[in-house]
UniProtKB/Swiss-Prot annotation:
This is Sulfate adenylyltransferase. GO terms for biological process: hydrogen sulfide biosynthetic process; sulfate assimilation. SUPFAM superfamilies: Nucleotidylyl transferase (SSF52374), PUA domain-like (SSF88697). It catalyses: sulfate + ATP + H(+) = adenosine 5'-phosphosulfate + diphosphate. Belongs to the sulfate adenylyltransferase family. It comes from Staphylococcus epidermidis (strain ATCC 35984 / DSM 28319 / BCRC 17069 / CCUG 31568 / BM 3577 / RP62A). Keywords: ATP-binding, Nucleotide-binding, Nucleotidyltransferase, Transferase. The keyword ATP-binding applies. The gene is sat. The lineage of its organism: Bacteria, Bacillati, Bacillota, Bacilli, Bacillales. InterPro entries: ATP-Sase_PUA-like_dom, PUA-like_sf, Rossmann-like_a/b/a_fold, SO4_adenylyltransferase_pro, Sulfurylase_cat_dom, Sulphate_adenylyltransferase.
Amino acid sequence: MSNNETITNYTIKPHGGELINRVVEGNERERLIEEALKFKPITLNPWGISDLELIGIGGFSPLTGFMNKEDYTKVIEETHLSNGLVWSIPITLPVTESEAEKLEIGDDIALYGEDGQLYGTLKLEEKYTYDKEKEARLVYGTTEEAHPGVKKVYEKGNIYLGGPIKLLNRPKHDAFSNYHLDPSETRQLFHDLGWKTVVGFQTRNPVHRAHEYIQKSALEIVDGLLLNPLVGETKSDDIPADVRMESYEVILKNYYPEDRARLVIYPAAMRYAGPREAILHATVRKNYGCTHFIVGRDHAGVGDYYGTYEAQELITQFEDELGIQILKFEHAFYCEACGNMATAKTCPHDASQHLHLSGTKVREKLRNGESLPTKFSRPEVAEVLIKGLREK
């Protein structure tokens, strides 16, 4: 086994056994950028660009491009790719019917962002129609347009393009450049740190005491923690990524052992697909080199669309196939009678002793400049959030 293979497989093999790399560099990149000027162009929205990047860097291994109809259908109907691997969310490239009419099978297509930047190319293998309501129902569990993920599906063009991609330019994550590591780089990092077991934690929210309790409980049984916050597109009322990132820096610096935790961004859009998205999140963290993944209450949920532990129940069905160990945690809270953080598994007291704050209530307090109870949030974290939101 080569040294590169040793590092790639140090903690866990990527999904499908190979870490995909569709990033084009050097002379080939220069040549392709020049050639792409003659290709038919398509503009991708931020969601599409983040998917393109994750395919390119191997975060979505084993995908090498946007899904063809066979894979798409298998994924939405059976939660698997056509090759038999577990996959829960369709990764697709939508266009309008008028755009699709201009494209021929076999075309090389230039993929631009809304900023006018060329990000990559697609070799067009397939154009196909799809049923939006069916996709919404099977992937999101609802056809209601009030669901932010479903709304996105309904707003998309009516045709999907399938084919392999090449990644020529990367979206800029300048504000987070210190924390922008690709799966090959996190795997190298874990090797260098000597972490054989790593737990991944997905978040789009600040880390409050309940999250800290869960992360540290997991850290008791593994070598390291990968705090892997999503920094792509989220709902407008979610706390902005730059404010959240500062809060992560503060809590790691003050409350976590330096040699046991690392902060790395996950440059994806949030789909709010609940149980199905939990499976995707676990798959991606496996590709980043995590051996364990935390799934808590209402993982990747929104509103009241999913049951509290529905994501845990679904992912348990696929855990053996996924090959990453799922750590399932109940909702954590501060118990006045216990005098510490706890869950229903460890606390005998009734709800009157438990401190609960909903995400909505937390955001409301922060935007009003109100401090959060120290039993709920570390004061340094609350300070960063209040200051950050006041400046927005």
